[in-house]
Amino acid sequence: MLFWILVAILTAAVAAVLLLPLMRAAEPLPSRHSHDIEVYRDQLGELARDREAGLIGSEEAELARAEIARRMLSASAADQAVAERTPKRLLSNRLAQAFIFLCLPAVGLCLYLTTGSPGVPAQPLAARLADPGDDVNILIAKAENHLALNPQDGAGWDLLAPIYMRHGRLDDAVAAYDRAIRLLGPTPARMGGYAEALVAQAGGLVTAEAQNALQKALALDPDDPRSAFYLALGLKQEGKHAEALAAFRKLAESSPADAPWLSLVNQHIAELAAAPAGPGPAAPGDPAPGDIAAAKEMNAGDRQAMIRGMVDSLASRLKEDPANLEGWMRLVRSYVVLDQRDRAKDALHDGLRAFPATGEQGKQLLALARELGIDAGGEAE
């Protein structure tokens, strides 16, 4: 009921604003022709005075008087025509008033009932933020609004950081983890999450900053599998195959038999065990140890250019040898880092052709897609 009362009040207010100019009595404005008539009368008087003073002859005076009289009659006729049109203007005003009073509210109501939803409650932004339901984007916006007002809320940054990570907002994830660590202090989960975000931000490179965070996480919890995995991956990227193999084997031995990361660890072990002793040449699509060292010293722009080259090389390698689960996972994640989500989706589908979704390795690809917010389409069924 309140809604319709508000509608009636607003309609009346709009109608009043529109009607006021129409209802105001029209003040007669002097027309141009009325002014001309006054001028002609003055000219006749001046002509008579000139005639009496002998400044003009009688014949010239008669001719001038006839011309002025003719002009005066013409102006009078035009002024009368203007006066006759005034009732028509008043009639049009009355019609406009009737339209505003009767038709405008009716037309507006019909349009609203046809295209609107009067039975649906209003959903202003503030109300949606107060009750976001299952909308993750609204939850994120609500958390961001809260943190904008309370930037020292470490728990809020700690909660938001992994959400940013799952949605591929890697720069925001790195910043949120950094704020949480500064405000709440380091924990294995925070340091490991921070390092993982740094690795993802660098396109899969375990940078020096990420290694430092991983070592701090392991110092707090020597059994943290995530930190152990990325440190081993960093050793592999640096060409320290023997150390990387030992680290991966240690992680495999300490992991439960049903650990979701175990198959990926075993794949690294198999690759390293089959590799020749010593650093050796880097596989196509993988950075050489020298490239890793150089990347750690690069600025963000140069590192991004290097990452794009590595990603293109990795994509070419996977076309020739698609039986590489880690390669597909790296490629999908790298495209997300480069904000090329369409290519990430294509890479996911290519990977699922090599590793069907019904298998264990295909499920890992689907899990990665869900983590990064990539639509797997019919492949997930």
UniProtKB/Swiss-Prot annotation:
Q: From the record, give the cysteines joined by S-S bonds.
A: none
Listed transmembrane segments = 2-22, 95-115
- Could you tell me which InterPro entries the record lists for this protein? C-type_cytochrome_biogenesis (IPR051263), Cyt_c_biogenesis_CcmI (IPR017560), TPR-like_helical_dom_sf (IPR011990), TPR_CcmH_CycH (IPR056413)
Q: What is this protein called?
A: Cytochrome c-type biogenesis protein CycH
Q: Which domain of life is it from?
A: Bacteria
Q: Name one GO biological process term.
A: cytochrome complex assembly
Q: Which family does it belong to?
A: Belongs to the CycH family.
Q: Which PANTHER family does the entry mention?
A: CYTOCHROME C-TYPE BIOGENESIS PROTEIN CCMH
Bilayer topology annotation:
Multi-pass membrane protein
User: Which PROSITE patterns does the UniProt entry name for this protein?
Assistant: TPR_REGION
User: Does the record carry Ion transport as a key word?
Assistant: no
Species name: Rhizobium meliloti (strain 1021) (Ensifer meliloti)
- Encoding gene (name): cycH
Q: Sorted alphabetically, which keywords does the UniProt record give?
A: Cell inner membrane, Cell membrane, Cytochrome c-type biogenesis, Membrane, Repeat, TPR repeat, Transmembrane, Transmembrane helix
**Role summary:** Required for the biogenesis of c-type cytochromes. Possible subunit of a heme lyase.
Subcellular location, in the record's words? Cell inner membrane
